[in-house]
From Swiss-Prot:
Name assigned to this protein: Adenylate kinase
Annotated region described as NMP, given as residue ranges: 30-59
Comment, domains: Consists of three domains, a large central CORE domain and two small peripheral domains, NMPbind and LID, which undergo movements during catalysis. The LID domain closes over the site of phosphoryl transfer upon ATP binding. Assembling and dissambling the active center during each catalytic cycle provides an effective means to prevent ATP hydrolysis.
Source organism: Actinobacillus pleuropneumoniae serotype 7 (strain AP76)
Subunit structure: Monomer.
Gene Ontology cellular component annotations, sorted alphabetically: cytoplasm
One of the Pfam families matching this protein, by short name: ADK_lid
Keywords: ATP-binding, Cytoplasm, Kinase, Nucleotide biosynthesis, Nucleotide-binding, Transferase
Biological process, per Gene Ontology: AMP salvage
Record-stated family: Belongs to the adenylate kinase family.
EC number: 2.7.4.3
Sites where the protein binds ATP: 10-15, 123, 132-133, 200
HAMAP family named in the record: Adenylate_kinase_Adk
Region of interest (LID), ranges: 122-159
Lineage: Bacteria, Pseudomonadati, Pseudomonadota, Gammaproteobacteria, Pasteurellales
Amino acid sequence: MKIILLGAPGAGKGTQAQFIMNKFGIPQISTGDMFRAAIKEGTELGKQAKALMDEGKLVPDELTVALVKDRIAQPDCANGFLLDGFPRTIPQADALKDSGVKIDLVLEFDVADEVIVERMSGRRVHQPSGRTYHVVYNPPKVEGKDDVTGEDLIIRQDDKPETVLERLAIYHKQTKPLIAYYTAEAEAGNTRYERLDGTKPVEEVSAELAKILG
């Protein structure tokens, strides 16, 4: 099963990705991890990517797709894979298609912006341990304090409302057009497209996913 996950940051993709990986025994492929691994291993593609990144330049789509193709040719992807964070744009989706990679299923996690802002801006973190809380969904016993150590909790920069809104703006501009792209691909019979309501409780979304995935 070759799957693409679509959805804004904070839409719950990460949680459900774990569920799919455990159910099917397929790896999650993140382009960030791939670049880091290729650079660390010193592969030819890794060297090219590093040279561009060191100059502060964006890695071109052809190079990213070449890395993806390299990665999905590895033995652990024999039964499929889960692409998260790629493709991000229509040119990347076209490049993936042109390179002959067939996607079986595209999953969209649909969550309204205001819900995402509430979800992410309510997160609190105990930095030394990495323990996370949420002021609404998973509050600490004492407001602003870690349950175990009693130390202060912080709001990460990424979770501040203004940062969340910036990330959402980029998502809507760059990635949302992919929803129309893959809906059209599904109508043409090239893939399957399923939309999930990401505002439902995690267990309900997982149960829906289990049905979709059969």
